[in-house]
């Protein structure tokens, strides 16, 4: 494995089925690979393990960063929390609980910033599939909006977003494993040809459409994240959550200048309007996505209004 680093300059390892290997092996393997990478001039070599679970259980994941000494693990708990709150009908407090448990990881909340996050994958299934399973009879329009909202969380909340191929083309699938591994090119697989796609995609054609609404939305989210250091590596503070679908709000703090970006999501089918706690130094704002008030309502308080199944991104600016 060290030869892959030295000969080909790979930037990291994704370790499949990491939970099924004795911890003592990872305790030796990880530092050895990091040392080889540093010697090869790759100081930020990233290693993360797959610890597959369908549960919103950060403790199950975190133990592998403490006992196995893996630098990071795929954040299956993030996928479960977004599935429950956006595809399903759970309150937004499940998201707050997810992030409260960041303290469990070796290195705490700072280490959780480098957890690879996702909402779809090749084993468990696609987010569009979960939306349709958890909400029988849902319209195509609402399915698309919920998938868009899930991706908005993926790109703006803490962690390193992992987009599963085909989600940007409206793939939903019919389950996990083979049922979530459709062809991007024109398929001849009968089960794939009969699938329901989101956003107007035709199941029988090829799927490289840069005009697809999900492709455009994900590209826009990637640009937003790329432009804002706070969204890539800033501290995250949960500002608002509740026991029912509705408002979930967080602040992301710019690691270079300390400025705040407030992100508010609405997981319900009715508009939400609320006062949200912010830093007292954050007084003037500009909209990065959606509609944002130009000024705080009072020191430490900011008004947000979010349409159903939508989100806003409001950035504090220097006065």
Where are these regions (language model features)?
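Active-site clefts of carbohydrate-active enzymes
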Residues: 112-140
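Solvent-exposed beta-hairpin/edge-strand motifs
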Residues: 278-292
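Surface beta-strand/loop "capping" patches
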Residues: 234-257
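Asparagine-centered strand-capping/turn motif at beta-strand->loop junctions
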Residues: 264-268
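Active-site-proximal helices and loops of the catalytic beta/alpha 8
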Residues: 1-2, 6-111, 115, 143, ...
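Substrate-binding cleft of secreted/luminal carbohydrate-active enzymes
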Residues: 151-171
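C-terminal beta-strand-rich structural cap/linker in extracellular carbohydrate-active enzymes
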Residues: 296-319
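Substrate-binding and catalytic surfaces of secreted/luminal carbohydrate-active proteins
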Residues: 124-126, 148, 156-157, 180, ...
